């Protein structure tokens, strides 16, 4: 399918008093629409930006221009059909107009294929273009690119706990938030109102689901609670506490005395050994003294016997 050539005579002359923002007047065989960025009109040549013969461009705030075209055998004012191509003007890759802009250069106009979002202007039709309600779509999407409906907020119904443990049984836990919503709000009255098991706490008054216990504690902490109760019952009698303390003191005293006696026994033994050694040394010295005197006397007697009598 080819497009018919557009001549200046076939294009309606531009009227500055008429609003061309929505769409141009019906043309037999060709239809031109402009959105926000610029206007196409025939015979308008006041602006220095010229495209073709007898075809002018009136630019607005943005530098993008779009063309919507299609062939129709008959004109319908209620519906339009737009398809084909998109024309996007770039100024050397910069969306802003520079001082050295050359409108006649081929590098300034770039054809950009668009296939982002369909925007129909009527009911889609599978027939030819002669139908007035043919489906058309712009080749550039406008507005928000988020295809979700406005006001839609996805709701997160579950939030994993950061301290989740696979070894912990969560079946016996009680949903406090649901209890508060249903009107049940247990209050904590004492320091033993909560039991901590592996870093997870349970409020007093919560009833385990899968167990028959009614003491307010889960199955994971029941054994510890029984031990605490047994210890509290044993320590409840003050006389027993006094007796146990006295017994402990006497045992400590006996141990201290035994250690003292052991120390004294060791010291006495060492002292007796030292005295025994001292006595032995004295006996040896006395024996040596007596031996010396005996030798001296014996020598004196022998000398007297050798002298002759005169």
UniProtKB/Swiss-Prot annotation:
Biased region (Polar residues) positions are 208-221
Any idea which residues bear Phosphoserine here? 77, 105
InterPro entries linked: ASIL1/2-like
Please give the knockout or disruption phenotype noted for this protein. Answer: No visible phenotype under normal growth conditions.
- The protein depicted here goes by the name Protein FIP2
Which keywords belong to this entry? Phosphoprotein
- Annotated GO CC locations: plant-type vacuole
- What's the encoding gene here? FIP2
Would you say which domain of life the source belongs to?
A: Eukaryota
């Amino acid at each position: 399918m080819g497009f018919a050539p557009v001549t200046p005579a076939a294009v309606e002359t531009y009227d500055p008093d008429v609003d061309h923002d929505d769409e141009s007047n019906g043309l037999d065989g060709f239809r031109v629409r402009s959105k926000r960025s610029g206007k196409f009109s025939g015979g308008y040549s006041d602006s220095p930006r010229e495209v073709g013969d007898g075809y002018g461009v009136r630019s607005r705030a943005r530098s993008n221009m779009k063309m919507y075209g299609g062939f129709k055998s008959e004109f319908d004012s209620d519906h339009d059909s737009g398809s084909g191509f998109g024309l996007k003007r770039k100024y050397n890759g910069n969306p802003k107009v520079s001082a050295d802009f050359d409108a006649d250069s081929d590098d300034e106009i770039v054809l950009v294929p668009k296939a982002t979002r369909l925007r129909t202007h009527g009911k889609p039709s599978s027939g030819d273009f002669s139908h007035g309600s043919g489906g058309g779509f712009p080749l550039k999407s406008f507005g928000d690119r988020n295809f979700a409906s406005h006001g839609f907020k996805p709701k997160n119904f579950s939030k994993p706990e950061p301290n989740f443990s696979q070894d912990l049984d969560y079946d016996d836990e009680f949903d406090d938030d649901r209890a508060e919503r249903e009107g049940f709000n247990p209050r904590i009255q004492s320091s033993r109102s909560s039991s901590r098991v592996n870093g997870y706490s349970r409020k007093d008054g919560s009833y385990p689901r899968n167990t028959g216990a009614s003491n307010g504690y889960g199955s994971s902490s029941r054994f510890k609670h029984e031990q605490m109760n047994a210890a509290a019952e044993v320590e409840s009698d003050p006389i027993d506490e006094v007796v146990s303390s006295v017994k402990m003191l006497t045992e400590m005293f006996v141990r201290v005395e035994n250690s003292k006696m052991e120390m004294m026994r060791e010291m006495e033994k060492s002292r007796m050994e030292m005295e025994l050694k001292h006595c032995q040394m004295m006996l040896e010295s006395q024996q040596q003294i007596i031996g010396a005197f005996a030798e001296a006397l014996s020598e004196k007697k022998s000398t007297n016997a050798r002298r002759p009598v005169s």
